[in-house]
């Protein structure tokens, strides 16, 4: 769901110094897809090992997580569980979009169109269960806390934030705000220079912060009303939304009538355009399936041997680079723990 037009006046650039010593609950699937999209060879294909297995996600997870830790940020990776049944239409839409992109990719290959090769190679990204499990395995070896969500990862990341177990949720999507996150950090795992699609132009990507309380105050609405706006625009549970209604119009409607049903009562929205259960979708955001972690979400000492086994022996990473990464990781975890303790002490003074 795209709330970009509504958050543009309240989002702000976030420096890593502001994040130092703080825990951030990261939408793991979202981060892995970002790594798959960003870490590519010149022809647009992902990094692979000698057996042809994709390794872009592991490369991004290892090195980017180290970078984040070196800034004093403590990452908690949250992974999706079983998606709600209401998401099936959106998942089917994504599957068909990938099939169409695969056809266009083959055409681009036969015609030698390099830019289209890159474009459609990214569009066919798939994150398999094996890739997810090996990502978790790597994170455990690195000493990074992970949380397995019962359902939506973003909902769980937001829940950890609500519980005070993280300072913010991190994702490129805005759904975490609807799920109740107090703060949303974007661009945490993709900071750096990125090429604009279909242009030979690079832009600097920096972390952004959106604070829910400030957003709601600026818009003059409640979280429940923001959820209604999301439903009108279209969410993962009703991807088409209401035809002809974008973010600005949705905001005007909800501010005028308070909720979707009232707008329907006054004829602002036609009942025939509602082919989904409004209360059901609201419930998915207001009362999502989440779980309170039983284990402490602390950083642990990295297991260098396990990291080398996963990256070097299983996936042909450079042993020298990985060993250098382990040294950086060990030092960064030690310093991040110190920064976290200092942040805790600062609250008392």
Curated annotation (Swiss-Prot):
Protein family membership: Belongs to the XPG/RAD2 endonuclease family. FEN1 subfamily.
Residues covered by region (Interaction with PCNA): 341-349
Region feature N-domain, mapped onto this chain: 1-98
Function: Structure-specific nuclease with 5'-flap endonuclease and 5'-3' exonuclease activities involved in DNA replication and repair. During DNA replication, cleaves the 5'-overhanging flap structure that is generated by displacement synthesis when DNA polymerase encounters the 5'-end of a downstream Okazaki fragment. Binds the unpaired 3'-DNA end and kinks the DNA to facilitate 5' cleavage specificity. Cleaves one nucleotide into the double-stranded DNA from the junction in flap DNA, leaving a nick for ligation. Also involved in the base excision repair (BER) pathway.
GO biological process terms on file: DNA repair; DNA replication, removal of RNA primer
NCBIfam families per record: fen_arch
Top EC class for this record: hydrolase
Cofactor(s) needed by this chain: Mg(2+)
Regulation of its activity: Heterotrimeric PCNA stimulates the nuclease activity without altering cleavage specificity.
Keyword annotations from UniProtKB, A to Z: DNA damage, DNA repair, DNA replication, Endonuclease, Exonuclease, Hydrolase, Magnesium, Metal-binding, Nuclease
Assembly and oligomerization: Interacts with PCNA via subunit PCNA1.
I-domain: region residues: 116-258
Amino-acid positions noted as binding Mg(2+) 2 in the UniProt annotation, renumbered to this chain: 173, 175, 236
Protein name (record): Flap endonuclease 1
Positions that bind Mg(2+) 1: 27, 80, 152, 154
Cofactor note: Binds 2 magnesium ions per subunit. They probably participate in the reaction catalyzed by the enzyme. May bind an additional third magnesium ion after substrate binding.
SMART domains in UniProt: HhH2, XPGI, XPGN
UniProt-listed Enzyme Commission number(s): 3.1.-.-
Signal peptide residue numbers: none
GO molecular function: 5'-3' exonuclease activity; 5'-flap endonuclease activity; DNA binding; magnesium ion binding
């Amino acid at each position: 769901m795209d709330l970009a037009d509504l958050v543009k006046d309240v989002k702000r650039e976030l420096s890593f110094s502001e994040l130092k010593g703080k825990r951030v609950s990261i939408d793991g699937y979202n981060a892995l897809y970002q790594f798959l999209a960003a870490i590519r060879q010149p022809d647009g294909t992902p990094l692979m090992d000698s057996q042809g297995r994709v390794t872009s996600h592991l490369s991004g997870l290892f090195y980017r997580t180290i970078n984040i830790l070196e800034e004093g940020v403590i990452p908690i990776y949250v992974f999706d569980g079983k998606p709600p049944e209401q998401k099936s239409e959106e998942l089917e839409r994504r599957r068909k979009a990938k099939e169409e992109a695969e056809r266009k990719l083959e055409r681009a290959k036969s015609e030698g169109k390099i830019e289209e090769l890159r474009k459609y190679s990214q569009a066919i990204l798939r994150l398999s269960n094996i890739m997810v499990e090996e990502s978790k395995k790597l994170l455990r070896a690195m000493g990074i806390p992970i949380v397995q969500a019962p359902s939506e990862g973003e909902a769980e990341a937001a829940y950890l934030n609500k519980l005070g177990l993280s300072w913010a949720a991190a994702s490129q999507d805005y759904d975490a705000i609807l799920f109740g996150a107090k703060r949303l950090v974007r661009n945490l795992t993709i900071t750096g220079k990125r090429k604009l699609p279909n242009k030979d132009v690079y832009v600097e990507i920096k972390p952004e912060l959106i604070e829910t309380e400030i957003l709601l105050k600026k818009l003059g609405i409640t979280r429940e009303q923001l959820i209604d706006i999301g439903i009108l625009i279209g969410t993962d549970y009703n991807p088409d939304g209401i035809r002809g209604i974008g973010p600005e119009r949705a905001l005007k409607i909800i501010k005028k009538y308070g909720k979707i049903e009232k707008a329907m009562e006054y004829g602002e929205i036609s009942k025939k355009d509602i082919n989904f259960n409004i209360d059901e979708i609201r419930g998915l955001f207001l009362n999502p399936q989440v779980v309170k972690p039983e284990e402490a979400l602390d950083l642990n000492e990295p297991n260098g041997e396990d990291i080398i086994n996963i990256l070097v022996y299983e996936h042909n990473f450079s042993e020298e680079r990985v060993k250098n990464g382990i040294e950086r990781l060990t030092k960064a975890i030690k310093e991040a723990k110190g920064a976290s303790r200092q942040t805790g002490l600062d609250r008392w003074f």
